């Protein structure tokens, strides 16, 4: 299963968490480069998106695209 992170929702969650991308990546336990790859990916794994959401302190449903 692949998911897409919504850019706007991600930006809001990042701002609400008061984190920089680097800080969020560190919380997710990955490099900034890998973190950016996941955030900008059109097809990220559910596990990867889950790590991003956890780093931001939100539920996955709060940052993914919905159609």
Question: Where do the PLM segments sit?
Answer:
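Key DNA-contacting residues within the recognition helix of helix-turn-helix
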Residues: 36-37, 50, 64
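Residues in the recognition helix of alpha-helical DNA-binding motifs
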Residues: 13, 27, 38, 66
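Short C-terminal boundary/hinge segments that cap the last helix of small helical domains
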Residues: 57-67
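Short, basic-rich loop-to-helix N-cap that marks the start of a DNA-contacting helix
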Residues: 41-54
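Alpha-helical residues within the helix-turn-helix
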Residues: 15, 26, 54
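Short coil turns linking two alpha-helices in DNA-binding domains
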Residues: 31-33, 45, 59
């Amino acid at each position: 299963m692949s998911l897409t992170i919504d850019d706007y929702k991600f930006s809001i969650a990042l701002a609400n968490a008061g984190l920089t991308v680097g800080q969020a990546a560190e919380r997710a336990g990955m490099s900034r480069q890998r973190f950016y790859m996941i955030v900008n990916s059109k097809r990220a794994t559910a596990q990867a998106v889950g790590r991003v959401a956890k780093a931001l302190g939100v539920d996955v449903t709060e940052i993914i695209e919905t159609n």
